[in-house]
A protein has these predicted regions:
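Hydrophobic/small residue at the entry helix of a nucleotide-binding pocket
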Residues: 18-19, 23, 167
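A structural signal for isolated positions on well-ordered beta-strands in alpha/beta enzyme cores
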Residues: 12, 45-47, 87, 160, ...
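Beta1/beta-strand and adjacent pyrophosphate-binding region of the FAD-binding site
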Residues: 5-17, 155-162
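Short hydrophobic core segments
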Residues: 108-115, 160-162
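Conserved acidic residues
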Residues: 10, 108, 130, 157, ...
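N-terminal Rossmann-like dinucleotide/flavin-binding domain of flavoprotein oxidoreductases
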Residues: 37-45, 52-109
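Dinucleotide-binding/catalytic capping subdomain of oxidoreductase cores
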Residues: 30-51, 59, 169-227
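Glycine-rich dinucleotide-binding loop and its adjacent helix/turn
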Residues: 119-198
Length: 227
């Protein structure tokens, strides 16, 4: 057995969301194939550090509650964590519990897979006014993020959503649904259901999607009014 075969690399991964977990799995697979050729050996220990009490990041706390099937991806991630060469440490926050110097002193490499943890600044006049929110904070609320808001103001009769991507569609869809519909078809957190029922009432406001023309908007409004 060569010296490289006896060497065990130590890798630290910051963030145990999909990117961190899959990167760990891919690294171990590639190391078995190419490690000896590259002089790295074929063995490694990967330590995953997650600041939340649970892993899987946006799969758990970023997918809209009315898409529970997408959250089944977590089962595949759990299988990856069954690998004895991957070790998960939750409730460990980079910059608070461990520093880069700490990690570099103990590991051969450090991978950051922290994702987008903050909203992108809007950089528009009035963006700092009351009633203007970033989607990330709203998503944290309706997904029950551990440190997210427990209450959210839902009394507005008219809401403008800036953007037309997947998150914008999720936000618009959540705003227009009533509490009974959410309870029946989603895994919405209990405090959010109560907030919808108490503040929004039974008739949520209509939403006009950005990916359609005036005719489609008119037909959507007519359909809601029963015309």
């Amino acid at each position: 057995m060569t010296e490289s075969e006896n060497t065990e690399l130590r890798i630290a991964v910051i963030g145990a969301g999909p990117a961190g977990v899959y990167s760990s799995d891919i690294f171990l697979r590639q190391l078995k194939k190419l490690g000896e050729e590259l002089g790295l050996g074929t063995k490694a220990r990967i330590d995953l550090f997650e600041k939340l009490p649970v892993p899987f990041g946006l799969v758990r706390y970023g997918v809209a509650p009315d898409h529970p099937s997408i959250k089944f991806i977590a089962s595949a991630l759990e299988k990856t964590l069954d690998n004895p060469d991957i070790h998960l440490y939750c409730d460990v926050e980079f910059g608070k519990d461990v520093t880069l110097d700490d990690l570099l002193a103990r590991y051969d490499a450090v991978l950051f897979a922290t994702g987008a943890v903050k909203d992108k600044p809007l950089n528009l006049p009035g963006a700092d006014l009351d009633g203007v929110y970033g989607a990330a904070k709203f998503v944290e609320w309706y997904d029950g993020y551990p440190t997210g808001a427990r209450e959210w103001p839902l009394t507005a009769e008219n809401v403008a959503v800036i953007g037309g991507g997947n998150v914008a569609m999720d936000v618009a869809r959540e705003l227009m649904r009533n509490a009974d519909d959410l309870k029946a078809k989603t895994d919405y957190p209990g405090q959010c259901l109560r907030g919808h029922r108490q503040q929004q009432g039974e008739n949520p406001p209509p939403v006009h999607p950005p990916r359609c023309g005036p005719g489609q908007v008119q037909r959507a409004g007519a359909a809601r009014d029963g015309e």
